[in-house]
């Protein structure tokens, strides 16, 4: 597996496009949650986890996982308007909650100023039985590697 730095898989960038905005020229609120999910997918890919190894498929594509990671909670807060052409830095902070769930906190910045934050929480389930289960190994590794730069903290 290639050398990974936090810079290249937990710190991403996004440019606001015309199609992301509403008639007032600012992003429509739901875009932030879509961008958050896309940033999570990009982070996994940059870390070295392929989508087919993380997400079960119903398209007849053979996958190596029978675990689904549905979103069980999400929220977003906006601090400043976000408009067409804005170049945003997106920082991801993944946090393991227990052996079967985790959340990712997202901070969106424009010129080093926070413009929005989001949080997306996932729960691991067996995709066939829909019963709760442990997180898949790849997600475990991604969470562990993500936490290394934060050090040890008291629970």
Swiss-Prot record:
Annotated pathway: Cofactor biosynthesis; phylloquinone biosynthesis; Quinol/quinone metabolism; 1,4-dihydroxy-2-naphthoate biosynthesis; 1,4-dihydroxy-2-naphthoate from chorismate: step 7/7
Q: Pfam families per the record?
A: 4HBT_2
Give the coiled coil ranges: none
Enzyme Commission code: 3.1.2.28
Indicate the residues that form the catalytic site: 22
Question: Does the UniProt entry include the keyword Hydrolase?
Answer: yes
Alphabetized SUPFAM superfamilies for the sequence: Thioesterase/thiol ester dehydrase-isomerase
Q: What is this protein called?
A: 1,4-dihydroxy-2-naphthoyl-CoA hydrolase
Give the species. Answer: Prochlorococcus marinus (strain SARG / CCMP1375 / SS120)
CDD domains, per database record: 4HBT
Return the InterPro entries for the record.
DHNA_CoA_hydrolase (IPR022829), HotDog_dom_sf (IPR029069)
Q: Which reaction does it catalyse?
A: 1,4-dihydroxy-2-naphthoyl-CoA + H2O = 1,4-dihydroxy-2-naphthoate + CoA + H(+)
Gene Ontology terms for molecular function: 1,4-dihydroxy-2-naphthoyl-CoA thioesterase activity
Q: What's a GO biological-process term for it?
A: phylloquinone biosynthetic process
Protein function: Catalyzes the hydrolysis of 1,4-dihydroxy-2-naphthoyl-CoA (DHNA-CoA) to 1,4-dihydroxy-2-naphthoate (DHNA), a reaction involved in phylloquinone (vitamin K1) biosynthesis.
What family is this protein classified in? Belongs to the 4-hydroxybenzoyl-CoA thioesterase family. DHNA-CoA hydrolase subfamily.
Q: Which UniProt keywords apply?
A: Hydrolase
């Amino acid at each position: 597996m290639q050398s990974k730095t936090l810079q290249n898989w937990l710190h991403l960038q996004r440019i606001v496009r015309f199609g992301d905005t509403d008639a007032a020229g600012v992003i429509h609120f739901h875009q932030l949650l879509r961008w958050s999910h896309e940033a999570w997918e990009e982070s996994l890919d940059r870390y070295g986890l392929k989508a087919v190894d993380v997400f079960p498929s119903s398209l007849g594509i053979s996958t190596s996982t029978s675990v689904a990671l549905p979103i069980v909670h999400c929220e977003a807060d906006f601090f400043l308007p976000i408009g067409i052409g804005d170049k945003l830095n997106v920082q991801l902070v993944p946090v393991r909650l227990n052996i079967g769930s985790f959340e990712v906190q997202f901070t969106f910045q424009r010129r080093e100023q926070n413009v929005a934050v989001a949080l997306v929480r996932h729960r691991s389930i067996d995709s066939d039985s829909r019963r709760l289960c442990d997180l898949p190994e790849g997600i475990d590794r991604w969470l562990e590697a993500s936490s290394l730069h934060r050090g040890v903290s008291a629970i």
